[in-house]
Amino acid sequence: MRAIKAKIPRSVHTATRLEVADNTGARLVEVISVLKYRGRKNRMPKAGIGDIFIGSVKKGTPEMRKTIVRCVVIRQKKEYRRPSGLRVSFEDNACVLVDDNNDPKGTEIKGPVAREVAERYAKIGSTATIIV
């Protein structure tokens, strides 16, 4: 897993609901906890682009609803700055469901994926149709 060069603000908090951008059957996921988050006492965990979190499926197919899943944030509304000086922001907060090896569960990803995510997770980058 490569380091992300851009300074990513962590704007996806606990209890945030994100759209699912793949074809696994889930449509909406609520953040429960963020993996590898080191914060201060009593501070709620936050995630940014490229972070893995544990979520609960709120909308989707009957088989997927009410299940606990691992996800990677691929888009966020809050803008972030790349080392080149370019500022990037997306229209929505979105994620992709992954397995224990951080490989995507779905076979296609709808919408753009941040370049930082494609560099860190090669399988997500190869599945994505648009990389921004």
From Swiss-Prot:
Gene3D superfamilies: Ribosomal protein L14 (2.40.150.20). It comes from Methanocella arvoryzae (strain DSM 22066 / NBRC 105507 / MRE50). Binds to 23S rRNA. Forms part of two intersubunit bridges in the 70S ribosome. The lineage of its organism: Archaea, Methanobacteriati, Methanobacteriota, Stenosarchaea group, Methanomicrobia. Part of the 50S ribosomal subunit. Forms a cluster with proteins L3 and L24e, part of which may contact the 16S rRNA in 2 intersubunit bridges. Keywords: Ribonucleoprotein, Ribosomal protein, RNA-binding, rRNA-binding. HAMAP family: Ribosomal_uL14. InterPro entries: Ribosomal_uL14, Ribosomal_uL14_arc, Ribosomal_uL14_sf. One of its GO terms (biological process) is translation. Belongs to the universal ribosomal protein uL14 family. Pfam families: Ribosomal_L14. The gene is rpl14. This is Large ribosomal subunit protein uL14. GO terms for molecular function: large ribosomal subunit rRNA binding; structural constituent of ribosome. It comes from the Archaea. GO terms for cellular component: cytosolic large ribosomal subunit.
